[in-house]
Amino acid sequence: MSAMSSVRAAGATVAWRARAPRAVASRRVATPRVSRPRRVTVRASGENRDAPDETSDAAPAIDAFVVPGEPFYPGMYADWSVTEEDVVEVWSYRVCLTAVALATLACASPLLLGGDAFGGALERIQQPAYFAGAAGLGAALGLIHMYVDPIKKFMQALWLAGLAGSAGIAIATHEAVPAYVAHHPSAVWAVGPLFAAFTGVAFKEGMCYGKPECAALFFVVPLSLLGHLSGLVHEGGEKALVTLWCALVLVFASRKYTQAVKDDIGDKSVFIFADMSEPERDAWLERTREEDPRRYARLASQER
């Protein structure tokens, strides 16, 4: 395997656990550029050096993702800074999780407080709250930062399947989905994939950031649904599990606002590299080899 191929393969084996990058002291750099008017020669291993060069101008500058005057973080492929677009994306993700948490509480309230509480208002808001929460989860799955894209797409597919099942129940029964599932345990099969997608989010957050509430959600959510589906958990046990579920998801959503934005991003350079075309990656790696040999050596060593 050539050195260039080894480096490209190394990028494909990045673990999906996001490690929070350490901030490096702010430095002044030139205005970020998308590309330089400089031709970069890309040669395969063992290629005849006397042969005409294959060139590419596609690669961005090495410092293209560092914002002047802002802290920057050392990534696998490049140094990078948090941009305004990153901030909006991360905060939108957090707002979506808040919507999920509030919807969970609204849907569970009739069980926890009784359906007649507040003149039956809690039962009337179940349906809009349920689908608002489902929409929030779908948006969160679009905004979440995950290195392994197939896993992200699988979670989105689960969400879509669960949303379709939920819509089918709503259309066929004209009942609020949470109420129907509460009285018909077999309906868990229809809505279950949506909650499996949420469990995936909890797993990712728990693994990446060591959040105990997310680790607990990873077990509480499936246990609640499977206990209801199988009938093995009695009514009092179900109520206790749902109460715990609500408490955990509220803590989860609230604590997201205490995280640094960079922590939610992970290593931004991995996403940047993944979005490049093959010629851009080749040119980028060649430019890194020429201008940042130490980083190139680290990339090459990951395949060994």
Say what each PLM segment does.
Residues 212-223, 245:
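Central hydrophobic cores of alpha-helical transmembrane segments
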Residues 28-192, 200-203, 225-304:
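N-terminal organelle-targeting presequences
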Residues 1-37, 44-47:
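N-terminal chloroplast transit peptides
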Residues 207-214, 230-232:
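Transmembrane helical hairpin unit
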